[in-house]
């Protein structure tokens, strides 16, 4: 907010230009790099050609160098969180198809939530919690299939910058509702809004069904 001659002007955040949909070649290189330290990004099976480079989501042909998406790849979901007490949602993923959840960010409750996540016994969901330095996050956001925004505001007045970044990356997103979110996210118009874990689970199921039809 800025005050000018007694009246207020609302100024909205804009995403940086480096937030954008990532080319498939860049996605593949990112997946291979993350696969060196995070098993959910590694190939589920070995390619017939040992020279073919394969991740959990993509593969590069050894002859042409062409990168393609795998047909039976898992969906890739990202949630970038500050790991605070305002971001407390649990999810029972028993009815979801194959899904890789990447949760990034740094905050006071990171280790606490990490322990809770690893106590879960999901059938089809893999979770990894990388810490991406500097400009490591934009390529990931430009490569995933869905974002889940758990950002809220203790004041109810701060809009989540992370959703703005998702818009720039042309990502579908599900955002947890709070007081002023409607200024940015319009439910079923530009993104989806949820109130609790049950609504989020229903939205994820809807997304998963659509993903399976397209993949």
Swiss-Prot record:
Enzyme Commission (EC) number: 2.4.1.-
UniProt GO molecular function: mannosyltransferase activity
GO annotation, cellular component aspect: endoplasmic reticulum
Composition skew (Basic and acidic residues), residue ranges: 43-62
Entry keywords, A to Z: Glycosyltransferase, Transferase
Pfam families reported in the protein's UniProt record: Glycos_transf_1
GO BP of this protein: protein glycosylation
Span list, region Disordered: 40-66
Role description: Putative glycosyltransferase.
Similarity annotation: Belongs to the glycosyltransferase group 1 family.
Name the UniProt record assigns to this protein: Putative glycosyltransferase ALG1L2
Organism of provenance: Homo sapiens (Human)
Lineage: Eukaryota, Metazoa, Chordata, Craniata, Vertebrata
Gene: ALG1L2
